UniProtKB/Swiss-Prot annotation:
Belongs to the PPR family. P subfamily. The keyword Repeat applies. PANTHER family: MITOCHONDRIAL GROUP I INTRON SPLICING FACTOR CCM1 (PTHR46128), PENTACOTRIPEPTIDE-REPEAT REGION OF PRORP DOMAIN-CONTAINING PROTEIN (PTHR46128:SF253). InterPro entries: Pentatricopeptide_rpt, PPR_P_subfamily, TPR-like_helical_dom_sf. This is Putative pentatricopeptide repeat-containing protein At3g15200.
């Protein structure tokens, strides 16, 4: 980091920390005053894995009530509440409560949770339901519902309502928990409210939650997740005496720089790790190798990969897959196959991703015999090596005739692999290119029956295919149908059809001009 930037970040951090001393949870809103609302994902710490990070958009539907809404009556009640709020979203909570009473609907924790999860992209129902929970004194067995509502409000950047709900939640003893902490960190970091995110960490003890290294990891993770890597590094340096030299925290910051694509800073921080008491582990190497391969620095990546074996830090299958894919991308197929042979012999065991990386590039260069040899090997091994929809997408993409498609479909059936919208669209594109109109209509009908389409991609393929054949009227008809379904066309599709809409007008003008000339000559 530049010296000036580092000083600014450190000053910002010190300012943030100096404002974090408050006496009670009720003062939360005084520290984070409501701002002008602005219309505009969530994981648990145990789900965070480098090189295989699963960032969920939200907390998702919880498993606390696995047997909820088993009968039609419960489902209908949820739908009724959803519709009432939808049609009366501008009404007061009191009015909505009266409507619910007239309909004989008693809100329960499970019912409210179901309705909230039906409206994860709309803040208003979540906020209304939070008010109804208070007005109807709905019994809550845990903080799960409040966490879900906070998550939705934070996601939509409705921080005035967010703070109001948190204030209400704080009045309930023991409701602010680790999950609440995650939601607060996630949503503040996502909205680039760095001060507030640090403040949440500083006041964990006021929430009745232990202040520990795992919580600090969570703060660093969310800051890096939303590109505040420089701030996260400065924060880590300022807390090094408290938490010591921690390779997991350093890996998070290294990963943050790599995700930003800043290889220069990643290399600098890598040297810091080497120079520290912490020794780089498999995650450190994997993160750095991933960054180098993405930037096309395959030579340096291979040096690190070989160094892992030499120092007995054996790479895991994700690192090996990354190396194989990078070698294939650079058209160094023999070297990729050699790495594949090595790990097949001494580990780690290859998985379906390993095979798919090879298949993608082997299909591209038409190494058909080797492709089917690997597919048969996958089928023989089974388990984590079994062919999946990605496998068959590569086989379909490079099919050259209808017979090839039939062979792939037979293989899919043999492996009990279900069709996906991606696979349907691949087949659809092939049949359009081959001018197999009967097959085109057949795939279209199958997509409608299965509920997997036709989607925006299907319409785009169809429209461009018809345009190529000069069937402009039919192409325009499909375009209008696509628009009527609320699908957003690609710019190239709009340009294509707009050009054709103007052409008849130009021709009409020319025709009128010619007629006028002829008439004047006859006069």
């Amino acid at each position: 980091m530049g010296g000036k930037n580092k000083i600014e970040i450190l000053f910002q951090l010190q300012s943030a920390l100096s404002r974090r001393r408050i006496s009670s949870l009720v003062d939360f809103r005084r520290v984070f005053p409501p701002e002008t609302p602005n219309h505009k994902n969530n994981i648990t710490l145990s789900r965070f894995h480098f090189l295989g990070t699963h960032f969920l958009h939200s907390l998702g539907a919880p498993d606390k009530f696995p047997n909820r809404f088993n009968d039609d009556k419960d489902k209908q009640s949820a739908l009724d509440v959803h519709n009432i709020i939808k049609h009366h979203r501008g009404s007061s909570p009191e009015k909505i409560k009266r409507i619910l009473d007239k309909c004989g609907i008693d809100l329960t924790e499970e019912l409210v949770l179901e309705v909230v999860n039906r409206n994860r992209s709309d803040w208003k129902p979540a906020y209304i339901l939070s008010q109804l929970v208070v007005k109807q004194s709905v019994h809550l067995s845990s903080s799960m519902l409040y966490n879900e509502i906070l998550d939705v409000l934070g996601k939509m950047r409705r921080f005035e309502e967010f703070h109001q709900v948190f204030d209400e939640m704080s009045k309930r003893d023991g409701f602010v928990n680790e999950k609440t902490y995650e939601v607060l960190l996630n949503r503040y970091a996502a909205a680039h409210k760095v001060d507030e995110a640090v403040g949440v960490f500083e006041r964990r003890k006021e929430f009745g939650i232990d202040d520990d290294l795992v919580a600090f990891h969570g703060l660093l993770m969310w800051l890096c997740r939303y590109k505040h890597v420089e701030f996260a590094e400065t924060l880590f340096c300022s807390r090094r005496r408290e938490f010591g030299c921690d390779i997991k925290a350093m890996n998070m910051i290294l990963n943050g720089w790599c995700v930003l694509g800043n290889v220069h800073e990643a290399k600098r921080f890598w040297k810091d790790i080497i120079a520290s008491k912490c020794r780089p582990d498999v995650v450190s190497y994997g993160t750095m190798i991933n960054a180098l391969t993405k930037k096309g620095k395959l030579g340096k990546a291979m040096e690190l990969y070989r160094a892992m074996w030499d120092t007995r830090r054996n790479p895991d299958v994700k690192i090996c897959n990354n190396v194989i894919d990078a070698l294939c991308f650079k058209k160094r197929i023999p070297e990729a196959l050699e790495v594949f042979r090595e790990i097949s012999e001494k580990g780690p065991d290859p998985n379906v991703v390993t095979y798919n990386s090879l298949l993608k590039h082997l299909c591209k260069i038409r190494r058909t015999e080797k492709v089917w040899e690997l597919v048969e090997e996958m089928e023989l091994k089974g388990g984590s090596c079994s062919p999946n929809d990605v496998t068959f997408s590569y086989l379909l993409k490079y099919s050259q005739r209808s017979k090839d498609v039939d062979i792939v479909l037979e293989r899919m059936a043999k492996n009990k692999c279900e069709m996906t919208s991606d696979l349907y669209n691949l087949m659809f594109r092939l049949y359009v290119q081959w001018d197999k109109e009967e097959k085109v209509r057949e795939i279209w009908s199958e997509m409608e029956r299965s509920g997997l389409g036709p989607d925006q991609r299907t319409y785009t393929i169809r429209i461009h295919g018809l345009h190529t054949k000069g069937k402009i009227g039919e192409a325009l008809s499909y375009f209008q149908e696509m628009m009527s379904k609320g699908m957003v066309p690609e710019p190239r599709t709009e340009m294509l059809l707009n050009q054709n809409k103007t052409k008849p007008r130009v021709e009409d003008k020319m025709l009128r001009s010619n007629l006028t000339s002829e008439e004047s000559e006859s006069d």
